A protein has these predicted regions:
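Active-site beta->alpha N-cap acidic-glycine motif
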Residues: 1-68
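Short, glycine/acidic-enriched loop or turn micro-motifs at the edges of active sites
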Residues: 10, 78, 218
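The substrate-binding groove and active-site-proximal loops of carbohydrate-active enzymes
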Residues: 19-26, 49-51, 78-90, 115-118, ...
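Aromatic/hydrophobic pocket-lining residues that form the small-molecule binding cavity
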Residues: 28, 32, 58, 90, ...
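C-terminal domain-boundary segment and adjacent tail
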Residues: 40-43, 193-257
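Metal-dependent polysaccharide deacetylase catalytic core of the NodB/CE4 family, i.e.
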Residues: 42-123, 135, 140-147, 168, ...
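Active-site-adjacent pocket scaffolds in enzyme catalytic domains
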Residues: 107, 114-213
Length: 257
């Protein structure tokens, strides 16, 4: 089972944190189009976890993704970490986000991912709130310790079912591998930049389950202070850009040749 997913909040964060620079909106639009084009070329469908605020303020972005045949999931309402919310705050946040996305695309939203994978042992009650609001699939668990959280007690690095007396959610945790005795993710975000493509591909091929995750910001050259393809090639010792690496991954692991 190979799953590709994207977390979509850049437009919303740009507007509310940086004032909404037109050139940044244009860049995000361009990279989203490149992603959707590659997924279409390879016959690949993904899940795009979107903040509810995007549905209210940038509905055209959400509808573009939905119209391309991809699943729209929820990524909270304003990208607030779940471990910073009380139960009551999460109830309000989740209801608002799910309702905004539902109204935007005209269909129910069933999948969820917490910003920064901010679900752990101390707030595992999150699943009860999500289930109450219609979530049936989740990908919020980082099953190891990390600088800001993680859920090492979860114990599973494969799809599982979270059960309680009134909750049943299918969980798709982030994939891990052992590096120098430490459990690390390898299939998305900054980790997709950290490891070589051959390393990532070999891990994927040895596993029956792989889930990758990206932000559009992850694919921008300036995220690493690199302004050109040549700088990228010198740093990673491979041809192209990080976007090219993502496309290569989609083609070889998910889509048709």
């Amino acid at each position: 089972m190979n799953i590709i997913s994207f977390d979509i909040e850049e437009w919303y964060i740009e507007k509310h944190k940086y004032g909404g620079r037109p050139e940044k909106y244009a860049e995000y639009d361009k990279y989203l189009d490149k992603i959707l084009e590659k997924l279409e070329q390879t016959g690949t469908k993904g899940t795009f976890f979107c903040v509810g605020g995007m549905a209210r303020e940038f509905p055209e972005v959400i509808r573009k993704i939905d119209n391309a045949g991809h699943e729209i999931g929820c990524h909270s309402d304003e990208h607030t970490w779940l471990n910073k919310m009380t139960r009551e705050q999460l109830e309000e946040d989740t209801h608002k986000a799910m309702d905004s996305l539902r109204q935007c695309i005209g269909k129910d939203v069933k999948s969820y991912r917490a910003p920064a994978f901010s679900v752990g042992k101390s707030n595992k009650w999150v699943f009860e709130v999500l289930y109450k609001n219609g979530v049936r699939k989740d990908s919020s668990i980082f099953p190891a310790s990390r600088d800001f959280g993680g859920f090492p007690e979860f114990g599973m690095v494969e799809p599982a079912v979270v059960l309680s007396s009134d909750t049943m959610i299918k969980e798709f945790p982030i994939c891990l591998t052992s590096v120098l005795g430490k459990q690390m993710a390898y299939s998305g975000g900054g980790y997709f930049r950290l490891f070589s493509y051959s390393f990532i591909k070999s891990k994927m091929e040895k596993s029956n389950y792989a889930i990758s995750y990206f932000h559009i910001n992850d694919l921008l050259p300036e995220k690493l202070g690199m302004k050109s393809k040549q700088e990228y090639e010198a740093y990673f010792k491979e041809k192209g850009t990080l976007l090219n690496r993502m496309k290569r991954y989609v083609k070889s692991n998910l889509g048709k040749a």
